[in-house]
Amino acid sequence: MERGKMAEAESLETAAEHERILREIESTDTACIGPTLRSVYDGEEHGRFMEKLETRIRNHDREIEKMCNFHYQGFVDSITELLKVRGEAQKLKNQVTDTNRKLQHEGKELVIAMEELKQCRLQQRNISATVDKLMLCLPVLEMYSKLRDQMKTKRHYPALKTLEHLEHTYLPQVSHYRFCKVMVDNIPKLREEIKDVSMSDLKDFLESIRKHSDKIGETAMKQAQQQRNLDNIVLQQPRIGSKRKSKKDAYIIFDTEIESTSPKSEQDSGILDVEDEEDDEEVPGAQDLVDFSPVYRCLHIYSVLGARETFENYYRKQRRKQARLVLQPPSNMHETLDGYRKYFNQIVGFFVVEDHILHTTQGLVNRAYIDELWEMALSKTIAALRTHSSYCSDPNLVLDLKNLIVLFADTLQVYGFPVNQLFDMLLEIRDQYSETLLKKWAGIFRNILDSDNYSPIPVTSEEMYKKVVGQFPFQDIELEKQPFPKKFPFSEFVPKVYNQIKEFIYACLKFSEDLHLSSTEVDDMIRKSTNLLLTRTLSNSLQNVIKRKNIGLTELVQIIINTTHLEKSCKYLEEFITNITNVLPETVHTTKLYGTTTFKDARHAAEEEIYTNLNQKIDQFLQLADYDWMTGDLGNKASDYLVDLIAFLRSTFAVFTHLPGKVAQTACMSACKHLATSLMQLLLEAEVRQLTLGALQQFNLDVRECEQFARSGPVPGFQEDTLQLAFIDLRQLLDLFIQWDWSTYLADYGQPNCKYLRVNPVTALTLLEKMKDTSRKNNMFAQFRKNERDKQKLIDTVAKQLRGLISSHHS
């Protein structure tokens, strides 16, 4: 029963579900009925549902039938009416068709026109859109064209600015166009191209600057020279209120424009062509020579591109290389001044450029970099000058070099470079200059001394007299009173040497100019150099003349006279130096001239040479002596050679009248002593082994001739018999042997007032031995004669006693 109730309940639920599904089918769109039918198939009551569905369809059919039956009459009436209007409708259709055909025929052209109008409208719209787009793209294209033009004309920095505007302002507005994408892709290449081209311009500029540094430096040094000349004029003609030019005014003005509208400034390589100006026109400034726009452009371009440090490093590296090239002097620089000038011009040009870059750019170069380069340049320049100047043997070239170095230093000092080391080096070159002057003046003195005739200067008129006195400070009242013609006591080399000493002093003074030295330093330099000239150069020249083999007594006498007058002129040289340096001789540490010593030494050397020369002449005469030491004849006159010798001495001493008295007296005494000594040696020489009393008698006549010459007073100033004392040894020796006064000699020997005080026992024994041998040889039978035997015994006895004196003296 319960099962039946459950079946009934299920049947009711199924029926309700089917009813719901049917309502849903009726109310749902056919396209969406699938899910509803899916629920039916998912169930198990398909048959019942179909029954329900058929039942529902039948119900609807009945309702439709009822409705149709209700409206059937109206439908029939409507059909009847429709049939009635069908003919009219056909007529209307025909009319409409005909009208349409006519309209189609008539509107065909209109349609074509409308189609054309449509196309025109479309074209107009496209043109308008195209114009709008072109107006948007045109600035981009114009900027790109401008960029190309700027690059073509090498206006790289403006081109870079244009490229920035193009990239950041214009291209973003039209970035969807394909050509813009091409431009965007090409921008890095353009930047690199600008970078490369600007670097190429910089390289051209650097190369051109390197080649034209000579011209730049020459211009700078000319301007420095003009400024110095102007300052000298101002100093010589001071004016109230005048102002010295500032350092900045002395700078060379450069063209500092970064951009220029002229094509020339855009295409230059750094150097502009300048025609040579006339000498009397203003020296062109460096703004007429140099355009630094390539440097500025490249610097700005690299700064904009973020590569400024790369540019700075490259620029400094290249300039360092160029500095090393500039500082390397040519091997033949020392041969001409132009070699030094070109070397200095290049260095000045280099640093003028760097100084300008320092003052016109922000950090491209800095003071530390400039100072480093200058230190290197200074050391290399000084080393090069030391090396090459040492080859200079021409003092004029050394002087010109000094002036060039001073101008070089002054030029760089204007630009703020320290140049003290250059002036210190000039002091070294000053010593070298002094040496070259000494060598030059050695040749001058040699020529003067070689060409001199060593004769007093004759003058025949007042003009000639004044001319000589004007050349050499000489005053002699007695000579002035003498009538013309007359002679100066000195020869021509005296005024010539004196004037050359003054010329040397002038030459030394020239070197000291512009060295920023005090008057005391200049005076000290001149005095030291002059002392070297006197004590070394002139002294050597005089000594060489004095020591010449062919020098004569007349020349030596004249040299003594000349040096005496030159010695007196030293005080005038002191005054001359004082006048040109304005430093009084009494100033502390003032160096004194050593001219007096120089001329005294030369005079003493000449005196010694006179003595030597006289002795040599005496020796030459003595070589003519031809004594017959074995003669038994007694002569009655002096030997011929001695007579000639005495005549020579008389004529020689007659020339000594202008010599100082002591010199003539010393020469005469020296000659007599040498003659006496030579005669004594002649008498005692070993080759003369034997001699006779007759030979001694002849020798005695010769000695008497010498004594007669001494008594005649060949040179004034000797006291009575003073000159005869030169022959006293010979006289006493000869008297001893001729008078055979041995008893007196032996008895008085050793006493202060001995008659034969000057006779040495050794000398007496030597001569006695020669006479003893002669006596034995020539008197073979003398032993048989009592007188001869007694004489021989006496000789032996005297000889024995002499030996005793000698031995006692030695003991």
From Swiss-Prot:
Pfam family, one: EXOC6_Sec15_N
Keywords: Coiled coil, Disease variant, Dwarfism, Exocytosis, Protein transport, Transport
One GO BP annotation of this record: Golgi to plasma membrane transport
CC per GO annotation: exocyst
UniProt key word Protein transport: yes
InterPro entries to which the protein is assigned, alphabetical: EXOC6/Sec15, EXOC6/Sec15_C, EXOC6/Sec15_C_dom1, EXOC6_Sec15_N, EXOC6PINT-1/Sec15/Tip20_C_dom2
UniProt-annotated stretches for the region Disordered: 260-280
Coiled coil: 50-119
Disease per UniProt entry: Spondyloepimetaphyseal dysplasia with joint laxity, 3: An autosomal recessive bone disease characterized by multiple joint dislocations at birth, severe joint laxity, scoliosis, gracile metacarpals and metatarsals, delayed bone age and poorly ossified carpal and tarsal bones.
Quaternary structure and interacting proteins, as annotated: The exocyst complex is composed of SEC3, SEC5, SEC6, SEC8, SEC10, SEC15, EXO70 and EXO84.
Similarity section: Belongs to the SEC15 family.
Role this protein plays: Component of the exocyst complex involved in the docking of exocytic vesicles with fusion sites on the plasma membrane.
Name used for this protein in its record: Exocyst complex component 6B
Name of encoding gene: EXOC6B
